[in-house]
């Protein structure tokens, strides 16, 4: 009913321009200029009519909000590339410079209680509001790379880039990010000849690289913001004031987040290319992690301050195996599989002291407590929740639920209420019982490819999945906790009652002594493992002898299907959440968004048909 009173209109115009110029300066030396331009214009308008929806809300007079925004950006890149072969030696080098600038401007206005049937910004001027915004961002880079190989046997490459960002203050704007790699193609060595009938390639790889990250919501995180409206009444006079630093400001020494990666790899090809294998082991150390951190409540400052919060280590192993062969003269096929396992851990906290734990996403109704945390010795963004242990079936169970000192743990509970685990053993269920109950990162991710071709027919399948990850189902919390006015899940019809005790849903009551609808418990945490048929392609290519008559090279008729099925215990729309900027923690930081399902748009199932023609 509410949405029937709302009329929303959005218009967006985008213009893109990409161009390049390339010239050979001297033999082997090429200059290239790349230019990219983009311009966006957006208009939005929302008109909300009158409504009376009882406890949900009431609007006695229409409201109107209008806005427009403009965004423009340009990217300029200059590069010089040099390639030279002399005998068994091959040398390639590149140097370049790039610059980028983004600028956005927004204007918004709104008015409440406007006259009905007059959809313009008129009416009560006291309720009118207007605001504007202007943001600019600049990034400059110098970079270079050199690669050398001898007889395709020994390979060496090195690169470095120097990036500068306007997000940081002077003295901290620039970061240097080098990398180096070496490779040894052992199968090219003379001593490997006895095995050359088995191995087509046997190569070892080692590399080190450093990458920088300056992505954050705020354009000017270290600059103080002056807030007006700091007014007070003294006698018959109103004093109008402004105050700096009312919102959170980052430290002046805020700088680049950097990730150092150490990698060792192996590439194998056997049996005339039928079997290939690639394996990589790696360690990634991320330093000066950019995270949003709240000020102490005593400061009176709201919002989150972006800080270089700590260090994170990722250790993992990746394996990819592929087999390609034929059966008879007409049927060819391939099978491929890949798998990754990784361990994630916060190794150091550098913001607020080594013992500090940084709270992340706070669900509505969580009382400001974080659902996930960034804490030393744990995976980043692990779920910090109170464990549940089923439902009390009888009063006797409640009376006997005591700690080691004989203290009754949930004295206010009734049969049908949730049993919470007293993790610290003090006989009280509170924030001290929150602890690590899982994290959003999978223990194991995998993929499987199958395909083949027979007399013009071809097919291909791709499966993917992951295991071991957890998802906080915020949608289910909203629909089943009883904390909200509005629609409830039909599952609540199966709530515990004296005549319906074989259920895992607690009794339904707006007031209860156990607080069955707590947000910061693992009642809303689910297994995010899944197995999915991601793509299925089927095609048929017309015979060549037929195509010659109509002077065509190739004609293929096909159907392509995506997301045909997903096997998962997760009750939401899709367990494949990835990362999102939609999680409301005051800033869009993917580290705290992963594994939080706030109503992510479900992945669509698509089936398409087509024809490919080559002349």
Segment roles from a protein language model:
Residues 1-48, 58-375, 520-615:
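Extracellular/periplasmic, surface-exposed regions of secreted and cell-surface proteins
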Residues 165, 466-556, 560-562:
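Extracytoplasmic gating/loop element in the C-terminal half of outer-membrane beta-barrel translocons
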Residues 2-8, 21-24, 398-419, 492, ...:
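Residues embedded in well-ordered regular secondary structure
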Residues 462-464:
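Transmembrane alpha-helix/helix-exit interface in multi-pass inner-membrane proteins
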Residues 307-442, 466-469, 473-475:
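Gram-negative outer-membrane beta-barrel transporters
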